[in-house]
């Protein structure tokens, strides 16, 4: 009888113990903590330069499941991800209005700066898929990143009402102003991180139909799958909240030299464009 009990119930107990190892630490940190808006001081990004062969992994391989150090590290990652899921983004956005962090007062030095991640996207003008880093390499780039209508609106504020030669400029509506950036070797790259291919096609079709994105912006306006960047990668860029919008100043070597999010303040707009033309 005792042998029968072990035969039928021991595997179940083992599985429960295995799951318990994962669930306990996750549940302990699952309740959202009071969000604090802090100023960026340390560089953000990845330590490895992006390559076309780069693929960011999410989770552990079967072999890693038997490595206690890697397993414990993954459990901690999952705990953070779990604590920031569901209504967390909504609650934080409502509280901060998308201002998840305050931009640094100066740009990060080249030897300290970290890299913008590898990303594949399709330009709105219908060209084939390409690596975003190929577009960034060799130019100073201002990358506008968003996933929702609110993020689109917030991130647009960094390009509107820019004072240049004593007049206000809008780099998203004025083609001549956009073209003039070439004189400073500066370009604007727009990235719409979408959840899936169906949504991507819908976004592209509606944007064209509404003539929201003029033809001169379309070669630099990309739809990219958000799934290419796992939670951990987005966390390194401080861009996990889908409701906000983000701006990254990326140098010619693909390093992030400055970043901002939410609606632009006058000082942030001034800093962004001053830094962009200085790099």
UniProtKB/Swiss-Prot annotation:
GO terms for biological process: mitochondrial proton-transporting ATP synthase complex assembly. It holds the Pfam family ATP-synt_10. It is found in: Mitochondrion inner membrane. Keywords: Membrane, Mitochondrion, Mitochondrion inner membrane. One of its GO terms (molecular function) is unfolded protein binding. Transmembrane segments: none annotated. This is Mitochondrial ATPase complex subunit ATP10. The gene is ATP10.
């Amino acid at each position: 009888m005792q042998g029968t009990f072990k035969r039928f119930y021991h595997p179940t107990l083992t599985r429960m113990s295995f799951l318990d190892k994962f669930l306990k630490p996750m549940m302990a940190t699952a309740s959202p903590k009071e969000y604090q808006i802090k100023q960026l001081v340390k560089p953000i990004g990845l330590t490895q330069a992006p390559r076309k062969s780069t693929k960011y992994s999410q989770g552990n391989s079967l072999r890693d499941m038997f490595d206690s150090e890697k397993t414990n590290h993954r459990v901690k990652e999952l705990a953070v991800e779990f604590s920031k899921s569901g209504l967390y983004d909504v609650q934080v956005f409502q509280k901060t209005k998308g201002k998840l962090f305050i931009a640094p007062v100066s740009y990060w030095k080249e030897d300290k700066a970290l890299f913008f991640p590898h990303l594949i996207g399709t330009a709105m003008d219908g060209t084939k898929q390409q690596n975003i880093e190929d577009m960034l390499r060799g130019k100073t780039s201002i990358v506008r990143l968003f996933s929702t209508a609110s993020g689109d609106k917030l991130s647009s504020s960094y390009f509107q009402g820019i004072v240049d030669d004593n007049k206000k400029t809008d780099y998203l509506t004025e083609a001549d102003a956009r073209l003039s950036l070439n004189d400073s070797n500066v370009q604007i790259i727009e990235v719409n991180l979408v959840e899936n291919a169906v949504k991507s096609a819908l976004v592209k079709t509606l944007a064209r139909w509404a003539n929201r994105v003029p033809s001169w912006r379309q070669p630099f306006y990309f739809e990219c799958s958000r799934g290419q960047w796992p939670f951990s990668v987005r966390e390194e860029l401080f861009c996990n909240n889908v409701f906000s919008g983000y701006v990254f100043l990326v140098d010619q070597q693909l390093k992030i030299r400055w970043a901002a999010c939410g609606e632009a303040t006058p000082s942030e707009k001034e800093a962004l464009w001053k830094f962009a033309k200085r790099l």
